[in-house]
């Protein structure tokens, strides 16, 4: 008779550990895209783990193309309808995000639900209404909030190229982030430093936490 009993620990070694959902948030031009790429490279090349980067809004989808036209000042739209479009853009990615995570791929994301809520609430839309649209989406495991004054962000290259890149509006967004969204589970990163200093801090946090997060279940936004 063939012995099919597995040795203790063998099943754990062969089981695929889930991927991590890592998110970068912050006002415009604080360096999110740069740090997304840096951490993606670190996870892939140093930790040797499968990794994919995403960005919201995803402007490649039909919904994303409508959003892009708005952001480029090509169209106008009711603010509540626009918020629902942004939220729908995240919902249409839900299944692919969960599939990647369950198959062991780490996802590093530039903006997500919190950004959508902050921007819409900064226009005066009810915060709770904005957030309700996001409930049920996959919840990030690690959130890096890149902190920089709105004034300093305006000094960076290409600032002002899109509809929302206005100083007073960015100040409102920052206030909503820090008063209603950022909590003790977010990693607040001082973005007024060199790219390498920021990258090293973020990579160090990931390295110290990813193994324990792999053993947890994927949560939902509530």
From Swiss-Prot:
PROSITE patterns xrefs: THYMIDYLATE_KINASE (PS01331)
The entry's keywords: ATP-binding, Kinase, Nucleotide biosynthesis, Nucleotide-binding, Transferase
Domain of life, source organism: Eukaryota
EC assignment: 2.7.4.9
Biological role: Catalyzes the phosphorylation of thymidine monophosphate (dTMP) to thymidine diphosphate (dTDP), the immediate precursor for the DNA building block dTTP, with ATP as the preferred phosphoryl donor in the presence of Mg(2+).
PANTHER family to which the protein is assigned, alphabetical: THYMIDYLATE KINASE (PTHR10344:SF1)
Subunit structure: Homodimer.
Protein name in UniProt: Thymidylate kinase
Source taxonomy: Eukaryota, Amoebozoa, Evosea, Eumycetozoa, Dictyostelia
This protein's encoding gene: dtymk
């Amino acid at each position: 008779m063939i012995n099919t009993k597995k040795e203790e620990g063998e099943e754990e070694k062969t089981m695929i550990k889930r991927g991590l959902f890592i998110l970068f948030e912050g006002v415009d031009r604080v360096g999110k895209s740069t740090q997304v790429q840096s951490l993606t490279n670190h996870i892939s090349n140093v930790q040797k783990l499968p990794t994919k980067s995403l960005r919201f809004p995803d402007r490649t989808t039909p919904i994303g193309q409508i959003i892009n036209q708005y952001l480029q000042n090509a169209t106008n739209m009711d603010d509540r309808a626009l918020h629902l479009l942004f939220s729908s853009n995240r919902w249409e990615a839900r299944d692919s995000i969960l599939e990647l995570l369950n198959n062991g791929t780490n996802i590093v994301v530039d903006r997500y639900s919190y950004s959508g809520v902050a921007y819409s609430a900064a226009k005066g839309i009810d915060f709770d209404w904005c957030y309700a649209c996001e409930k049920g989406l996959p919840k990030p495991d690690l959130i890096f909030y890149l902190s920089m004054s709105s004034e300093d962000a305006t000094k960076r290259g290409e600032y002002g190229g899109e509809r929302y890149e206005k100083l007073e509006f960015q100040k409102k967004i920052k206030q909503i982030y820090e008063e209603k969204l950022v909590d003790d589970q977010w990693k607040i990163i001082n973005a007024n430093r060199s790219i390498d200093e920021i990258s090293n801090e973020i990579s160090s946090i990931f390295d110290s936490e990813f193994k324990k997060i792999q053993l947890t279940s994927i949560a939902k936004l509530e």
